[in-house]
Amino acid sequence: RRAQKLRAQAMARPFSSGAKAKLLLVTQPERIPQSQIYPFHHYAADLKRLYGAEVREADLWDVLGNKPMVATGATVVAFQSPFDISDDDLFRLIESLRAQNPGAIIVCLDWFAPTDLRNAARMDPLIDFYVKKHVLRDRSLYGKPTLGDTNLTDAFNRRFGIDEPEQ
């Protein structure tokens, strides 16, 4: 697949010394989280031409396993995480990213359901930006309670008559 090939290429090269901007994506290899990452690779040539930016990638599980990253010294590090990442793993991940990319802007790329913000509050003091993969078309729905913790659980709970507390 094209996406896998582009990911492998981005994981195999360090940043060049002449890059104006260096974007390191620390990502999960699974299909749904990768759908958030593919556009960065698809438009990598345009990012380089227009902004002098290089895009590289590292596997989240390798970083958490303390495997050395090929690309370090990024100016921006954008990372994904599992929704159930432990506090210890989250703190260790961010500490490692900051140590290997001093002065970098740290961004969380949240690939979860549109109304699932379970990690936003605990990441707030640790990162510079929190980016959702997608948002609800009708943004007024964000102020309304759901049955369960996301719009997806709300839809299933209502459809199948599952009793969940409003949140």
Task: For the regions a language model picked out, list residue spans one by one.
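Catalytic core of nucleotide-activated saccharide and alditol-phosphate transferases
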Residues: 96-167
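N-terminal pre-catalytic "stem/leader" segment of glycosyltransferase-like enzymes
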Residues: 1-120, 124
